[in-house]
Every structure is written in C-alpha cells, then in structure tokens.
C-alpha cells in the first residue's frame, strides 16, 4: 500500500510540472504555420504553434 501512495504522489507531481518541453521563442507570429520554419531553424523540429503572438516549439 505504501508503494501505491508513493506512485500516486509521483504521478501528481509529474502532472503539475510542465513536462511538455515547449520552448518559447522571441519570434513574433500571427499564425502557427509561421512557426514551423522558425522551430526547424532554432530547435531542429517543425512542431510549433503561435501562442500570444510568440512561437512555441515542441520537441
């Protein structure tokens, strides 16, 4: 029963912490497709989206 509570606590902590590995850039944007080339150039991934007029890249 102790192990179950430890695993539950670890799951809660991991879900609270931002584990998405998203990285904000200083590049401004108006649409997510503008971020794809920026993310490819800066972080070697083409997965990105425009959030609050800034590109966010996901690895």
From Swiss-Prot:
InterPro entries from the UniProt entry: Scorpion_toxin-like_sf, Scorpion_toxinS_K_inh
| Keywords in alphabetical order | Calcium-activated potassium channel impairing toxin, Disulfide bond, Ion channel impairing toxin, Neurotoxin, Potassium channel impairing toxin, Pyrrolidone carboxylic acid, Secreted, Signal, Toxin
The organism's place on the tree of life at top rank: Eukaryota
Q: Which GO terms describe its cellular component?
A: extracellular region
A Pfam family annotated for this UniProt entry: Toxin_2
Q: Write down which residues bear the modification named Pyrrolidone carboxylic acid.
A: 23
Feature type site, description Basic residue of the functional dyad:
49
Pinpoint the site Aromatic residue of the functional dyad: 58
Q: In which tissues is it expressed?
A: Expressed by the venom gland.
MF term (GO), any: potassium channel regulator activity
List the disulfide bonds in this chain.
29-50, 35-55, 39-57
As given in the record, the signal peptide range reads 1-22
| Cell compartment(s), UniProt | Secreted
* Annotated segments matching region Interaction with Ca(2+)-activated K(+) channels: 48-55
Give the UniProt family note.
Belongs to the short scorpion toxin superfamily. Potassium channel inhibitor family. Alpha-KTx 01 subfamily.
Q: What is the documented function of this protein?
A: Blocks calcium-activated potassium channels (Kd=43 nM on KCa1.1/KCNMA1). Has a potent presynaptic facilitatory action, with less effect on direct muscle stimulation.
Q: What is known of its domains?
A: Has the structural arrangement of an alpha-helix connected to a beta-sheet by disulfide bonds (CSalpha/beta).
What is the protein's given name?
A: Potassium channel toxin alpha-KTx 1.2
Highest classification ranks of the organism? Eukaryota, Metazoa, Ecdysozoa, Arthropoda, Chelicerata
């Amino acid at each position: 029963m102790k192990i179950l509570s430890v695993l539950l606590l670890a799951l809660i902590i991991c879900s609270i912490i931002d584990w998405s590995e998203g990285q904000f850039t200083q590049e401004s944007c108006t649409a997510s497709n503008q971020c794809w080339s920026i993310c490819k150039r800066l972080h070697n991934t083409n997965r990105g989206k425009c959030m609050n007029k800034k590109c966010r890249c996901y690895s």
